[in-house]
């Protein structure tokens, strides 16, 4: 990396930080954007298992929660990972880089960076996210004040409590695809976890061919078991109560269902 780039990209650091940046090689950087419940932990572990890739899973969150560090995102986050893995051909993160930071990363890094979006079938994904909400002891982790706007728009709750507001929040997260699709190629987690050809193509496209995938590696990777499942038991049928179906119908935008349909996910019958 040239001196000019060091000045532009690391000028906010002190002298020791700039010297460290200048004298440590920076690998190709990537991120996979996802709001979760889409095999993000599995994908990060799988990428990190490749000898040419260093991949974290929202390490910035754990630095803040467990180490008391300042929360960092985007370039400030990826440059730490990159300096941690100078021998890797590609380095990045799954689930820890916000979609809002992508334009800045592209502007700063150009062809030395790439991004992908990871999704999953909407309703099973929602069920997994709801299981996380239910099982997590600190409900205030998520800000649900904003869902009042849905209540004001006649989305009915059987009881106005944090669990039901978290449901509305989870439903609204399905609208994220509207903002994600224009940012980067969208990949289905169902394909990456089961199809070796798709996984190999994903890795090579994500790393702009810095990493070439052997078929045997992809075959082994897709045999890796699921990790960090939020929903331990199969969902009972029907999966949603009437008020929840009504909320899904009112909150998820038609544009979101259209995008999911293009991705090959069937729109729920109750939407039509």
Protein language model regions, located:
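A short acidic, amphipathic alpha-helical/loop segment
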Residues: 101-108, 176
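Conserved phosphate-donor/acceptor-positioning beta-strand/loop module used by diverse small-molecule
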Residues: 109-132
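Short aromatic-enriched loop/helix-cap "lid" or pocket-rim segments at secondary-structure transitions
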Residues: 66-70, 105, 127-131, 137-138, ...
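Short catalytic/ligand-binding loop motif for oxyanion handling, primarily in non-cytosolic enzymes
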Residues: 38-44, 62-65, 99-101, 123-128, ...
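PAPS-dependent sulfotransferases, especially Golgi type II membrane carbohydrate sulfotransferases
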Residues: 1-25, 162-163, 171, 175-179, ...
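PAPS-dependent sulfotransferase catalytic domain
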Residues: 76-79, 136-201, 205, 250
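PAPS-dependent sulfotransferase catalytic core
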Residues: 1-89
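Glycine-rich phosphate-binding loop used to anchor ATP phosphates in small-molecule kinases
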Residues: 85-104
């Amino acid at each position: 990396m040239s001196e000019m780039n060091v000045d532009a990209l690391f000028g906010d650091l002190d002298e020791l930080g700039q010297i460290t940046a200048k004298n440590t090689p920076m690998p190709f950087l990537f991120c996979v954007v996802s709001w979760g419940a889409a095999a993000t932990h599995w994908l990060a572990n799988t990428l990190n298992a490749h000898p040419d890739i260093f991949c974290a899973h929202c390490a910035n969150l754990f630095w803040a929660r467990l180490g008391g560090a300042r929360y960092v995102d985007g370039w400030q986050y990826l440059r730490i990972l990159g300096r941690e893995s100078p021998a890797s051909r590609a380095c990045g993160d799954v689930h820890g880089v916000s979609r809002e930071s992508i334009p800045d990363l592209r502007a700063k890094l150009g062809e030395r960076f790439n991004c992908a979006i990871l999704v999953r079938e909407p309703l099973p994904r929602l069920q997994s996210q709801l299981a996380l909400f239910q099982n997590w002891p600190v409900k205030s982790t998520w800000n649900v004040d904003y869902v009042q706007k849905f209540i004001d728009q006649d989305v009915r709750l059987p009881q106005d409590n944090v669990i039901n507001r978290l449901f509305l929040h989870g439903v609204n997260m399905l609208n994220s695809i509207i903002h994600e699709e224009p940012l980067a190629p969208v990949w289905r987690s169902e394909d990456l976890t089961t199809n070796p050809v798709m996984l190999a193509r994903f890795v090579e496209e994500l790393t702009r061919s810095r990493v070439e995938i052997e078929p045997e590696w992809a075959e082994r990777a897709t045999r890796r078991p699921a990790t960090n499942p939020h929903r331990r038991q199969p969902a009972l049928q029907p999966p949603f109560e009437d008020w929840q179906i009504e909320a899904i119908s009112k909150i998820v935008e038609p544009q979101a269902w259209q995008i999911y349909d293009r991705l090959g996910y069937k729109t729920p019958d109750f939407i039509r």
